[in-house]
A protein has these predicted regions:
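Motif-centric detector for short Cys/His coordination patterns
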Residues: 1-101
Length: 101
């Protein structure tokens, strides 16, 4: 049963990787004051940190410490304790519903 569950999880991950946007890299561009995400598809997406929960008001040094998750489906800032889903960011979700209201 455990092997079956692992196989199903791997299959789901393969499908998600094929149809959902994944980040190849991400960085903070201080000159434009934007977080830039380079997607595996070759497209680029960027947004100002001021509109994102946990990033608003952060220093350029802290914003520059963005990490892409190994699967490419998330961004993480350790010092800021901030995490974002790449598909959610592309859909315009920059925080919780309460924060965005």
């Amino acid at each position: 049963m455990k092997e079956y569950a692992i196989a199903k999880a791997r299959e789901a991950a393969t499908i998600a990787n094929a149809v959902e946007p994944r980040a190849e890299s991400a960085y903070y561009d201080q000159s434009s004051d934007r977080i830039v995400i380079n997607l595996k598809s070759g497209a680029t997406f960027s947004f100002p940190p001021e509109i994102a929960q946990g990033l608003a008001g952060a220093s350029p040094e802290d914003l520059a410490e963005v990490e892409v998750t190994p699967s490419g489906d998330g961004l993480h800032w350790e010092k800021l304790d901030a995490d974002f889903s790449v598909p959610a960011l592309l859909a315009g979700v920059f925080g919780t519903a309460v924060w965005m209201a």
